[in-house]
Curated annotation (Swiss-Prot):
This is NADPH--cytochrome P450 reductase 2. The chain crosses the membrane at residues 52-72. GO terms for molecular function: flavin adenine dinucleotide binding; FMN binding; NADP binding; NADPH-hemoprotein reductase activity. It comes from Arabidopsis thaliana (Mouse-ear cress). InterPro entries: CysJ-like_FAD-binding (IPR003097), FAD-bd_FR_type (IPR017927), Flavdoxin-like (IPR001094), Flavodoxin/NO_synth (IPR008254), Flavoprot_Pyr_Nucl_cyt_Rdtase (IPR001709), Flavoprotein-like_sf (IPR029039), FNR_nucleotide-bd (IPR039261), NADPH_Cyt_P450_Rdtase_alpha (IPR023173). FMN binds at residues 111-116, 166-169, 204-213, 239. It is found in: Endoplasmic reticulum membrane. The keyword Oxidoreductase applies. Keywords: Endoplasmic reticulum, FAD, Flavoprotein, FMN, Membrane, NADP, Oxidoreductase, Phenylpropanoid metabolism, Transmembrane, Transmembrane helix.
Amino acid sequence: MSSSSSSSTSMIDLMAAIIKGEPVIVSDPANASAYESVAAELSSMLIENRQFAMIVTTSIAVLIGCIVMLVWRRSGSGNSKRVEPLKPLVIKPREEEIDDGRKKVTIFFGTQTGTAEGFAKALGEEAKARYEKTRFKIVDLDDYAADDDEYEEKLKKEDVAFFFLATYGDGEPTDNAARFYKWFTEGNDRGEWLKNLKYGVFGLGNRQYEHFNKVAKVVDDILVEQGAQRLVQVGLGDDDQCIEDDFTAWREALWPELDTILREEGDTAVATPYTAAVLEYRVSIHDSEDAKFNDINMANGNGYTVFDAQHPYKANVAVKRELHTPESDRSCIHLEFDIAGSGLTYETGDHVGVLCDNLSETVDEALRLLDMSPDTYFSLHAEKEDGTPISSSLPPPFPPCNLRTALTRYACLLSSPKKSALVALAAHASDPTEAERLKHLASPAGKDEYSKWVVESQRSLLEVMAEFPSAKPPLGVFFAGVAPRLQPRFYSISSSPKIAETRIHVTCALVYEKMPTGRIHKGVCSTWMKNAVPYEKSENCSSAPIFVRQSNFKLPSDSKVPIIMIGPGTGLAPFRGFLQERLALVESGVELGPSVLFFGCRNRRMDFIYEEELQRFVESGALAELSVAFSREGPTKEYVQHKMMDKASDIWNMISQGAYLYVCGDAKGMARDVHRSLHTIAQEQGSMDSTKAEGFVKNLQTSGRYLRDVW
């Protein structure tokens, strides 16, 4: 017992050091095994000291992590060049807000692809240079508060705040802004509680979509209603043109307003002209031993209980088949990801995010343009060697890997380059003529030329680099300031867990288009799916990191409620999941309400996808009626909205009985036409004027009976 007591005391001393945030340092890596016995003793202590259970469990994980890093450092200390030294492990307490008497500005962002975050950080960087006595903080909206009460408690303490808010899909907030947006838009009874807040909003959207910058507009309106003082008109960034120019114009309008708030009284000094630095990571080159460690780390990368974009599940492709007939000159793929035993789950109507690799031909072209070895193994660092941050604008670096892997997994190479990328290329162009041309394209004077030569021509980053061959940015610049991060592609899941619990089905049309420059654009993810090898064909099957994003595109909780589904082409995907779920209900004896599916394709002989399945759904009673529009069979083109008008009376009767309406597919064309048809049906069948009909349709949306999954 005395021995046990002594041992317990030493454990508590060790725990105290960890809790206080004091470094835990192993001076001799050879003694790493001793820490394994320490971990074992800690485990046994759990039984005797249950009050320390939570702390001890966490500490074991920390200690084991320390051991692994120490062993790796020791084994890789041969000929590595500029390998980062292992820093002492310090557990930091939660950062507390410190009132140092300085004025404070908070810059929030809600981003899906990183653009809003980039603009927020760019504003913060320049503002810090202009107003040195002010404290600026960049905040992810999802990290700002743990719950609704904390949102309100913290926001009412803000004096100056800026919101960078992207809108995507059917006028929806981004994933990291969804919780804030729901709370903020539902709080209509707060009164003018934000009278002390001065603010600005910059939105990111695409004018081709119906709900252009809806999220930014809604937040701006509510801020005014609740007493906040608008410093500058809401910025409406349009990604269909040059959103960087929109941001620049909004930012320039902001500075005079900020001067009146943040400049000290009597300070007449003119702000020093600010030039944004070209973003650059610090780069370390490693040897093969370091590469071996990272390969082991990546191989065990699925040990997560919660899967998201940062922690996806690497799923094998179980099934792949072509849905178009050989007569079709296009392609549509049915793909099934195997999630058996992973812990990854989904619900009918959810989306799956797929992180696909760039094509090898694309990567080869990038390697040629960079003129570097594909086997160069490196790591990126967002801080200097002394640990201080290089720039708050740098995105988190990806894990160490070789150059081919980095270009394959992480670099977006086929999108049109932003102006900031052209500036970065200009800084590393050895030919002065090329450097000046790149600078001109990125300048206000070159706005029209950039719009025509880059945006309208849809020139890819690699095409632009090929036009300026002397521009050879180093790795730190290329991955920080030239090539944006490759983003996941989202697909409506085309299955139901009631039928396919261990599979996620995807229905994907191949993207294969000729660009204005003559380049053939091959969609990154759709081409990967087209070329995927399923394990039903080979043990050496294809796999991809995936994760599930929840959706509100759900069937009514009451199965007897009528449903109207409208989805041409791959817009059929979520409705296939709906019908699988209804089939499972039918087979279990559940009574279903009326249902109709409006589907559209070009020709029955070419692209009537899932035709046999749809007929079986009708025969089983899972689907009451199937109405198909063929746009290329008759003398005139017929689309789903025409079929809707043919069934206007039936649709109105179903709506009158409480039906839910669902639309999935193209937001720019089809969804708008369907919306207009619905408006017309309400007018004609409901004997309403145009204003009342629009109000009726809007009420269907706000009450959750008119749902859209559009892109």
